[in-house]
Amino acid sequence: VSEKMEEAGLLAQELDDQNTNRQKATRNAQEKAEDSILAGEVSNLISSFDEEYSSGIVGLVASKLVEHYYRPAIVGSIEGEFIRASCRSINEFHITRALDECADLLLRHGGHSMAAGFTVHKDFKDQLLDKLMVIADRELDGIDLRPTLKIDIELLLEEVTPRIYPELEKLQPTGMGNPAVLLALKNVDLADMQQIGKEKTHLRFKVPGSQVEQAIAFNQSQWYETWLSQRPKFDLAF
């Protein structure tokens, strides 16, 4: 915090640089983790450990892996004789209870159903993963591991107007116990799609026939080539 404009500007630039470096490190670690995962079979629980992973980003990388593969994910930073790991999970798998079953192998652990962390001696890594894999196979047996969205209301194009926003505001505050309403448009055309962001990972587009001037889909750039070559109709959740 600074009351001097010049100093505040320098501090803001420093924070922006740190954020950019953190994002780059997260992307690099995610790519490396995905390479190691795809080198084998994608199982009910995925993991990646490396000396190059910073302990400050392993949770972010694990979250990205869960988002992409919809599997419980463990990402760990190897620091000398020890591994410090972050876990992110899915609704169907209580990650901390799984770690509780492996407490004899861990130096420390803690968390809740969807996220946890632990420290383990690197000599016990393989034994730990084997045990966690048995637990994951047991708990997730027969479950269709595909991410789902619970749509509250499906709208018609002509219903997407500025008038819906005051109605949604009446439902605030949202959060645990009162999740935000999820709306959907199905089978709609998209126009003027562009890849945006420093890494071109987001999409910006228009929805013809609606009052939506512009929409942004974060981390959905994989659909750009499909739109460009096929011009399919899309289902949108927002």
Annotate each predicted stretch with a short phrase.
Residues 1-123:
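Hydrophobic helix-and-loop "lid/oligomerization" segment in the mid-to-C-terminal part
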Residues 39-43, 52-55, 67-69, 79-81, ...:
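Short flexible coil/turn linkers enriched for glycine and charged/polar residues
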Residues 103-108, 134-141:
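A common structural junction motif
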Residues 110, 168, 190, 231-238:
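OB-fold and OB-like beta-barrel modules that bind single-stranded nucleic acids
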Residues 124-130, 223-224, 230-237:
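OB-fold single-stranded nucleic acid-binding module
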Residues 156-207:
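Long, low-complexity segments enriched in small/aliphatic residues
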Residues 210-228:
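Beta-strand/loop nucleic-acid-binding surfaces
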